[in-house]
Design a protein with these regions (language model features):
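Generic structural signal for well-ordered alpha-helices
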Residues: 87, 125, 152-156, 179, ...
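Auxiliary Fe-S-binding modules of radical SAM enzymes
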Residues: 7-11, 17-60, 129, 253-378
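Catalytic cores of alpha/beta
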Residues: 175-182, 238-251, 308-319
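Glycine-rich, proline-tolerant flexible connector loops at the mouths of alpha/beta enzymes
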Residues: 86-89, 139-148, 200, 266-275
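Conserved, mostly hydrophobic/aromatic
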Residues: 44, 71, 99, 138, ...
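Core AdoMet radical
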Residues: 106-121, 128-149, 154-219, 228-235, ...
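An N-cap/entry alpha-helix motif that binds or orients negatively charged groups
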Residues: 46-83
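Canonical Radical SAM [4Fe-4S] cluster-binding loop centered on the CxxxCxxC motif
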Residues: 79-120
Length: 378
């Protein structure tokens, strides 16, 4: 687990109920180059490799506070002090892939496999709807049992019952034809983390049968079809460098996704990366802030992984420019089995507990949870 976070700016409610950053003078000992670089990145909505290196090396409290404050200001211009909430349904932990970092990889014989039925998933949606969720995220491994027909039937059923809700799919690499079928059935969004945009790094994380080119093509296919598209990567994955992170940011700039999901790499004991060091909260928060500065309107989650490496991780993510949280709606008896990484939080809480816990956490830092679809705002 991470140590206590570095100090960050306290926030209070302004008269208009939008979160207001308490102004504190920047100490003169903060490197002026850092402040200037942050302002340049914000204004240009782009970053060079040299600028990225400089910002990721910030280690003084004032520099870290400044970049996070600037990211929050940028986020609030579009989204105010509203945190968008999604209900996560992890419906299968079967997967045909063998990614070296993932606890549900094909060759992990220790994984306790499960699949939810359509009825179970609709029950999750029903309880979620009552709790105010208006986006459902259906996430799972690449499981051949769930054919295109089954996915389309499920999406159609959810949209028919809850026409005011968005359905997000996160079920991996498929053909363009499959993606089109899901879209025509009513799916609104699709999350597909690219994990790394660097070819050599991709090969360190995945077996030979998987290809970065194919994953990138999937993202472009999804965008062309008309989805709100999400990509993303782990922070601190084995083999990651400042140079590979720069490639990630360039891919994001090229793709212009509606969502970017990043969180710290956390090892899982039954994978080839069991003994690898986890990514840090500090670097994750800095990267959240950088992504917000260069993509002001992007939907940016404060992930469960961030909450796993620090008890206040999700709050700190919001205070670094994130604006989405995804409490778990999955049945409690399967949550522990969806073990992408170890020590995952909130596996024993009922959906209502997760919902109100999240609301209270956000209130504690001056934010409100929005009961809406939470679409991307241009």
């Amino acid at each position: 687990m991470e140590s206590e976070p570095k100090p960050f700016t306290q926030i209070s409610q302004g008269k208009n109920k939008h979160t207001k950053i308490e102004e504190k003078p920047i100490k003169t000992n903060m490197n002026e180059e850092i402040k200037s670089t942050i302002n340049k990145v914000k204004q240009s909505r782009n970053i060079s490799l040299e600028q990225l290196k400089l910002l990721l090396e910030i280690n003084d409290d004032e520099g870290v506070r400044f970049i996070r404050e600037e990211a929050v200001k940028v986020c609030q211009k579009t989204y105010g002090n509203r945190v968008l909430i999604r209900g996560l349904i992890e419906f299968t932990n079967f997967c045909k892939n063998d990614c070296y970092y993932c606890g549900i990889r094909r060759s992990n014989s220790q994984a306790d496999r499960y699949r939810l039925t359509k009825e179970q998933m609709l029950d999750c949606c029903a309880s979620g709807y009552e709790l105010g969720f208006r986006t459902f995220v259906l996430q799972g491994g690449e499981d051949g049992y769930f054919t295109d027909d089954k996915i389309c039937d499920l999406v159609s059923a959810i949209k028919e019952k809850y026409p005011d809700c968005a359905v997000t799919l996160s079920i991996g690499e498929k053909s363009k034809e499959s993606y089109k079928r899901y879209f025509d059935a009513g799916a609104d969004r699709y999350l597909l983390r690219h994990e790394t945009a660097d070819e050599a790094h991709y090969k360190k994380l995945h077996p030979e049968e998987m290809s970065l080119a194919h994953r990138k093509q999937c993202l472009w296919d999804l965008k062309e079809i008309g989805y709100q598209v999400g990509c993303g990567f782990m922070v601190g994955s084995p083999g990651q460098t400042v140079e590979t992170l720069y490639e990630d940011l360039q891919l994001i700039r090229e793709l212009q996704p509606h969502m970017v999901g990043i969180g710290p790499f956390i090892s899982q004991k039954d994978t080839p990366f069991a003994d690898k060091a986890s990514g840090t909260m500090e670097q994750t928060l800095k990267l959240l802030a950088i992504i917000r500065l260069i993509h002001p309107h992007v939907l940016l989650p404060a992930t469960t992984a961030l909450g796993t490496i620090h008890p206040k991780g999700r709050e700190l993510g919001i205070l670094s420019g994130a604006n989405v949280v995804m409490p778990n709606l999955s049945p409690v008896n399967v949550r522990e089995k969806y073990k992408l990484y170890d020590n995952k939080i909130c596996t024993g809480n009922e959906a209502a507990e997760c919902r109100y816990c999240m609301e209270n956490r956000m209130k504690s830092i001056g934010y409100e949870v929005a009961v809406s679809r939470g679409d991307y705002i241009e």
